[in-house]
């Protein structure tokens, strides 16, 4: 056993003999003259080459020798791959595997404190940041405090990981010359630095550096005599580089770098060493490690004798990706490239018109590879594209092995948690309530009954002009449905959601407890089922663990608003991922660029190669600009691009590669990745028939693009629809219509057919928004109430009386304060001219009835006409004036005579006494009362016998539609400004035919007869 005691804080020393075996066989020559660094060429399967090199250096007579090797890998996935390769060789020993990010196994008893709970620290810092933002509101919104705290934690962690003194940045001479914005940023950095110093907490990056320092002391004093290897890392972090330097100098230590480009010449290496902007080159990471270890990058020995599988392609790509200062070498070195045929033989290039077609083409190629028994890997950082490819593969019931899984926020438990969080402190909307009730994890105990209630509530209440759902409204719906179970169900919903409504500002832990209780109660259902599916399966377990961690840290959250709380929950959930529980296809994989470094496939598909996607543009740093980072020794934004370029260079070195990109994404034109531009530009200018080679690459890619477009194109020519004019049996035609729908019968008979023959009615909107129709309805009610209350005489101040009634009705009809204010202003502008015109009307007639309903049976055609007169006035001699309120533009008299017969038919109903509780009316005139102040009232007086002629015209219209051969033509007389988009235009397939096309009658009586037994 090894015991370590602290010396000078983090310094460690041995107290007993090292546990490592002393009879280890040497893997390398003892006492190296310089640090050992090896490389593996581009295109070589790195884990396989690593294992081959280890076994080649061991005594085959000592199978246990590998067990004495300490192997430090870059990632868990690489460790897993090595284990799989060793197991595939049969029974044997495994090396002692560790990871760069987890060194505790190398110093099990190190006196290094554990890293602090990052979530609790972030919540505490968010409080401090929020307080600082209150003093300077212009810097950022207070609701962004949690995200700003996360950014500060990351930069402090980076400072610790790179071993930079924070005071060097805060008190930097460069910073003194920067803008006022930096002075604000410095205040935040000082805040975090003071918090870290006072709390004594250490971040994960700081702990990692302390472990490396402890390991350095331990191995410097007592160097291990067994082999120690660090493999697969490019030293992108300062702590990792320090560990690599330590291992490379051990007597039996070595560093093995992946993806070394052995075609880079001295000129390029020299350029990379002296160029100002050099970190975006794919081999800069190799150069940086080599320089820090005192090694010339061009002299790095190979770990094995394996050569690159496609040296010609490596040379081509290496030349294409040379730094900008030496791209003139394309002209000198390009013509000397050999074996261009071999370089591009397995390379295909596909440019799709859209990301959807790109995803389908990729899915087709992956399906073909699986059919041929090949291992295929889709490599891309674009998670939207990977989801599209996954969806496309489901066409053939193929589930890919996605290394990234699904974000927890997109899983069923994550979505439910987010949906409920969005309800805290907000008014419940109909759409939010329906989405919540239809969530698959809500009320899983009695799901069938729950879905029936949800559907009925939506159709009977939420879609019936319900601006804001209320408990009273839901209870009224339940009473109408006459079911105790529905009332219990409604009470359960509101018992879950009511505690969330009136929350303003509260302690984070209180808000979290209220939130989680609502989520659990919704999942349990009215019966309080404890065994709900919310926390079950992988996604549920991950959600439970994440929310438990948030609960543990919640006491550090302080006082937050609902918006701030929601952003915290969203941020925490988005950082976690869940693996798909469905067993995937073993040979169809989706990798990120990091996974592609340590695994191999027969076919690599490099997708989403657009600039800003691959490579991804560095995110703006709100704290330090590039000059300050450079002066402090922190990583530059270009380093991330360089690492991404290194991943691309390794992936394109595979034997068979398909490169894809989409020309447009979400309707926006894209730019090809800079690496693709370089390769295509180089090929275009090569004299070795490079232009034709590029054309061959495109042709191979276009094969899959053509397949994708073919699979999306319907087979055979689909005939265009004709302008419909269905002729249903007369018995199926409507025998009753209202006066307002007669215009529809004249203008668009097909709409009458769809609504009254087929029984198709569009669903009402789920969320009611204030629009012109709703405003017109409200004004209609206001005027009706005004007339009812002033029948006998106008009050002394009629305008004030109108505004008083308007305030009462708008409070009910317009629950939105801003809308209510706008409509009140509209009413105030309308009130004065309306009162003046009302005074004129009452000089020759007085209000008699409002909302006068009636129906008229025309026995000659067996048809019932229904209608409602908004207002009927009587003159002193008993003659009637019929008015109809119109919120839109009033139709001209010509339109009323030919098409809009509403007022004329109301006059007909009045003349024959069709209105309820009313005798026959001697109708003198009709008019529209415009709710628009710009329109004046225009009375239409009827001549003797004119109303009777209106009745005869109506009978002729109905008789015409009672003719079996008369079809219900679509858009017979379309409204001038209607265009496309009427509720039944899609059913009529308008757009496949034009308004000038003749109608095609379709006799439906034969279909009716065929259905009869």
Predicted regions and their residues:
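RecB-family 4Fe-4S metal-dependent nuclease core
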Residues: 525-527, 667, 716-1013
